[in-house]
């Protein structure tokens, strides 16, 4: 994959994580599109997003279902989730226990599909929970928390 879409704003710590990941992606030569969750210019940003992605070259990295929560701007006029329409895989790093996201996990399964959805858990117990209660989840991984140095 050559391109990644990340989200800024929302929860402060998650925005920080996105910013740090963006730096690493850029260092690796991956183009980054930063979607501002608090923008007033939604239509312009969606137009730019559509110009940015290329099927087979783009993926989304998000935290706690940002971009997968049913935000109107990410659906086309027929109600199809843009990520599904463009076949953009979504890597969702879930930092809270997954039982908080039962409804969103159902939404993802129905609207995106399990082939395009990758869930990363930051706790081994969260990963065990996912494997037990969501066996239909094809892509589930553990990634320990990292740190930054200043």
Give the location of each predicted region:
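Extended catalytic core of nucleotide-activated donor transferases of GT-like folds
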Residues: 7, 14-132
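Nucleotide-activated donor-dependent transferases that construct or modify glycoconjugates
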Residues: 1-11
